[in-house]
Amino acid sequence: MVAGILRSARRIVVKVGSSLVTNEGRGLDEAAIGEWSRQLAALVRGDAGAAREVVMVSSGAIAEGMKRLGWVGRPREIHALQAAAAVGQMGLAQMYETKLREQGMGSAQVLLTHADLADRERYLNARSTLLTLLRLGVVPVINENDTVVNDEIKFGDNDTLGALVANLVEADALIILTDQKGLYTADPRRDPSARLVRQAKAGDSALEAMAGGAGSSIGKGGMITKILAAKRAAGSGASTVIAWGREPDVLVRLVAGEALGSLLVAQTQKTQARKQWMADHLQLRGSVVVDAGAAAKLRAEGKSLLPIGMTAVEGDFARGDVIAVRDASGAEIARGLANYAAAEARMLCRKPSTEFEKLLGYSAEPEMVHRDNLVLAAGS
């Protein structure tokens, strides 16, 4: 099972936590980051098989900031932690940029908050940017924007962020690197009879009972946050592997199909999960009417909706809102996330993408609704 899932994964999110990225909290572990960068580059280049698109979610900014500021212990005051994050993020980004460049790879720093992914317009902007970076062969290095929010420092973790990013880019797999070999039936540091869980269903309630409590004083996430992250990633069809980050060539060996760590299998296909998400959680804000040619292509081929095929726009919606796509008779063909607000969409009706910049003053997506954000109506 692990061989099939990881071998076939073409888009992967890798999350690495503070306890691995840092030298026991005393700044960044340069050798470890260099080693993961080497493996990331191998995956992107396809050194041992098919080329992959890889996103890195990395903690470590606060620990690096503490080192640069000369602090021995982790402060409790929120604004001190935010200041440390601001100082340390400089070093974290620089370290990844240096190590990936040594491997001939480009990198990009992306700072996100949970609010960015909860807002539909910002969600689409973040998604478009990340997918563009992946198409360019660049490795995005993502961290929580600790300087402007409190939630991650106080309660949250980058395991959750890793799962949200997996959902955002529709990853095939999430790999969480940790300081444990994987998920055990009990805490192996306290129970010598604890056994490694090789494979389970993501979302199995029994896993949470096994997971135990909080993590180290360096990071905030324990095994329970990884279980919950795997459950969240499974909601969009991504399976999760929890593995020891110090295992030699761990990433390369995983994508080659070697059974390392614990595999938590998603039970939902990606397309099914996306349909369920759009059907259950998003409110219809407006609609566009399309001509017969566009309607036929949508129904038969599931193509993206281009403005040139639109004849009318109904309602007042914003970029990122859910809209219906209707034929001339009013029958609903599909629903999807709008790349343009209603006022802009009206300007783009019947227009080719080559005219967008002249009409809008900027050039963005060529589609009104991208096929990845489009769900055909039942019976279409």
UniProtKB/Swiss-Prot annotation:
Name of a matching Pfam family: AA_kinase
A Gene Ontology molecular function term of the record: glutamate 5-kinase activity
Entry EC number(s): 2.7.2.11
Source taxon at top rank: Bacteria
UniProt KW Cell cycle keyword: no
Compartmental location: Cytoplasm
Chief localisation class: cytoplasm
Family to which this protein belongs: Belongs to the glutamate 5-kinase family.
Name used for this protein in its record: Glutamate 5-kinase
Upper lineage: Bacteria, Pseudomonadati, Pseudomonadota, Betaproteobacteria, Burkholderiales
